[in-house]
Design a protein with these regions (language model features):
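A transmembrane-helix-recognition feature enriched in membrane-embedded lipid enzymes
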Residues: 1-40, 68, 109-118
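Helix-to-loop junction immediately C-terminal to a conserved catalytic motif
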Residues: 27-60, 70
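Structural alpha-helical scaffold elements that stabilize or flank donor/cofactor-binding regions
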Residues: 47, 114-115, 149, 176
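Catalytic core of membrane glycerolipid acyltransferases/transacylases, capturing the structured
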Residues: 49-133
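Internal catalytic-core helix/loop-beta-alpha segment
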Residues: 121-166
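A cross-family acyltransferase "interaction/gating" segment
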Residues: 151-156, 161-203
Length: 203
């Protein structure tokens, strides 16, 4: 891999690798020390194709959910079944993992911007922004970027579009599935609200 090779969004892959390693090492103890992440069903990860996979998950924190998935996916690909023991699996992380996130969330501070570079497909929410209700049309460029990410690799999406419990699923995920026809893998997250703050930055 050339040191200046870029992904379809223009991000330098070498820099992305360094950021994923750093974030993984810094966050690992939160899932294997202060908390104990319990994983089930990760055996399917290793058999998935390299592109066009959509993970559909509930959402409990802004960031801890996604970071945990980066750990689990990379650990599973390196042969660790339902375990993230020994952070060495991040030495050669999968670089084509993306996640759908609100643009306002990923531009609010240095750490969110670093997390965005690591894999965010940032979109404008159509119903809410900065804590206020809005009503606007879907940006076709946002849909196109999600399709671009699927063509390149794996995408994580949160169809509720919020960390609040029991919210209905937004229609966007169904549209993405119908349009791009990815392999769909459901994920259930539980207990993160009790273990982390809302943003998933504090224990």
């Amino acid at each position: 891999m050339g040191i200046l090779k870029r992904n379809p969004f223009g991000h330098i892959l070498f820099l992305k690798k360094m950021l994923i390693r750093y974030l993984g090492i810094m966050s690992h103890r939160r899932y294997r020390g202060f908390n104990q992440l319990h994983i089930e069903g990760s055996e399917i990860i290793k058999n998935l194709p390299d592109q066009k996979v959509l993970f559909v998950s509930n959402h409990q924190t802004y960031y801890a959910d996604v970071v945990a998935m980066f750990h689990v996916f990379n650990a599973s690909l390196s042969g660790r079944l339902d375990s993230i023991k020994n952070v060495g699996y991040l030495w050669n992380p999968k670089l084509n993992i993306y996640y759908v996130a609100a643009k306002e969330t990923m531009s609010d501070g240095l750490l969110p911007k670093i997390l965005a570079y690591a894999g965010s497909v940032s979109i404008e929410r159509t119903w809410r922004e900065s804590g206020k209700d809005v009503n606007r049309q879907v940006k076709f460029s946002d849909i196109s970027n999600i399709g671009k990410a699927l063509d390149d690799g794996w995408v994580i999406t949160f169809p509720q579009g919020t960390t609040k419990p029991f919210r209905p699923m937004r229609k966007g995920t169904a549209f993405i599935i119908k349009k791009y026809k990815p392999i769909v893998v459901p994920i259930v997250i539980d207990g993160f609200r009790r273990s982390f703050d809302k943003k998933g930055l504090m224990i």
